[in-house]
Amino acid sequence: EPKEKDGKLTAGLGAGGHWDPKDTKQHGYPWQDDAHLGDLPALTVLHDGTAANPVLAPRIKHLDDVRGHSLMIHAGGDNHSDHPAPL
């Protein structure tokens, strides 16, 4: 279900925050042990909206670990930082 922020309903907010079972409270690279497990590798999406290249998530060992969680795909790049700057 969507959640409200600043008076506007936003579908993505219903997914919750990054998956962070180790309680690191920081963003990082997918292979970095001291970052959210929810920080995944970049997904290459073509102009027609399809994504066919495999993505490896080296720190996720079992599919059961992510069962019941949402997968959010953001548009644009990622600088893997808690203090984003323009890319």
From Swiss-Prot:
GO terms for molecular function: metal ion binding; superoxide dismutase activity. It catalyses: 2 superoxide + 2 H(+) = H2O2 + O2. It comes from the Bacteria. Cu cation binds at H18, H74. Keywords: Antioxidant, Copper, Metal-binding, Oxidoreductase, Periplasm, Zinc. Binds 1 copper ion per subunit. Pfam families: Sod_Cu (PF00080). Residues 1-33 are annotated as: Disordered. It is found in: Periplasm. Its cofactor is Cu cation; Zn(2+). Signal peptide: none annotated. Zn(2+) binds at H18, H27, H36, D39. Its main location: periplasm. The keyword NAD does not apply. Destroys radicals which are normally produced within the cells and which are toxic to biological systems. Homodimer. Belongs to the Cu-Zn superoxide dismutase family. This is Superoxide dismutase [Cu-Zn]. It comes from Aggregatibacter actinomycetemcomitans (Actinobacillus actinomycetemcomitans).
